[in-house]
């Protein structure tokens, strides 16, 4: 199986919004489909916190399923027979793009906490530099999911007139206090792990306990009480599945959280986790509108937009999607707003492919 990732060298130095700069930085990305002669069929996908650029499999390359496998491909909602699709791994991540886990060219050691403060505007700027390098003057559609939806807003705010249509998926124009509080606890769990060592952890002494707790807190917010009740109720583990220690796991829901945590702890770098979650806290469309989200959204000019939210999302509540839809419409866009009742909460866009495909595919077919 060949690696379908490609790498784009960013300008060196690459200036960061909150100060500092990167030398020799790169962006990992993957593409599907073929760019049209007029370069007018490009779709850019900006991801959530942890995904790589591998949104879907490649028949002639990396055939492993991608994180949005059911959404992207020939004849699917995002039809690669029509669209040239680009998915980037966010700047600051650890899935190929330069981030806190990358070696600092000046020292050869990982950046860790010496990495400059990261803003989602930096994520957007890096993606924009790639788009320009590919010869694309204007995106046919910009898709942003979760954190990537905020990065997409940053992209459109910084590069006015360079996006024809936008699909906003389960995102927000700014983080609400609940989301900030949860992410604060996640970072605290990592930093309080003795193996964190102010960012000087190693593979042998790795903050697994802190990462596991951070992931468990995240999973709780990514799903909904409706799903917890429907899947687990109060079902207990069989006796042979319970650890033999006081206050250990007893309910199935506890085992589920532990399973997801253990799958994650070594798959995502702790320092990258801190940087990207804080960048999500900092982003605020109101900064572009003299303190007003609606005035900030008024600076975004696209012809068409689809805004999707889910009623069970507690991390980015549905009213925040409604706010984006109203703001883009007030700025002159023709907006479709879709409110779904999926029980999976914030993660519904990764799970409820049937309903999200219907909305996204239906919208793209009208472009």
Swiss-Prot record:
Pathway: Amino-acid biosynthesis; L-cysteine biosynthesis; L-cysteine from L-serine: step 1/2
One Gene Ontology term of the molecular function aspect: L-serine O-succinyltransferase activity
GO biological process: cysteine biosynthetic process from serine; homoserine metabolic process; methionine biosynthetic process
Reactions catalysed: succinyl-CoA + L-serine = O-succinyl-L-serine + CoA; L-homoserine + succinyl-CoA = O-succinyl-L-homoserine + CoA
Family matches, as InterPro entries: AB_hydrolase_1, AB_hydrolase_fold, HAT_MetX-like
Catalytic residues (positions): 146, 313, 346
Domain AB hydrolase-1, residue spans: 41-351
Annotated keywords: Acyltransferase, Amino-acid biosynthesis, Cysteine biosynthesis, Cytoplasm, Transferase
Places the protein is found: Cytoplasm
Segments for region (Important for substrate specificity): 48-51
Principal location listed in the UniProt entry: cytoplasm
Binding site for substrate: 215, 347
A GO cellular component entry from the record: cytoplasm
Enzyme Commission number(s) of this protein: 2.3.1.-, 2.3.1.46
Site features described as Important for acyl-CoA specificity, chain residue numbers: 183
NCBIfam families membership: homoserO_Ac_trn, PRK00175.1
Biological function: Transfers a succinyl group from succinyl-CoA to L-serine, forming succinyl-L-serine. In vitro, also has homoserine succinyl transferase activity.
Quaternary organization: Homodimer.
Family: Belongs to the AB hydrolase superfamily. MetX family.
Protein name according to UniProt: Serine O-succinyltransferase
Source species of the chain: Frateuria aurantia (strain ATCC 33424 / DSM 6220 / KCTC 2777 / LMG 1558 / NBRC 3245 / NCIMB 13370) (Acetobacter aurantius)
Lineage of producing organism: Bacteria, Pseudomonadati, Pseudomonadota, Gammaproteobacteria, Lysobacterales
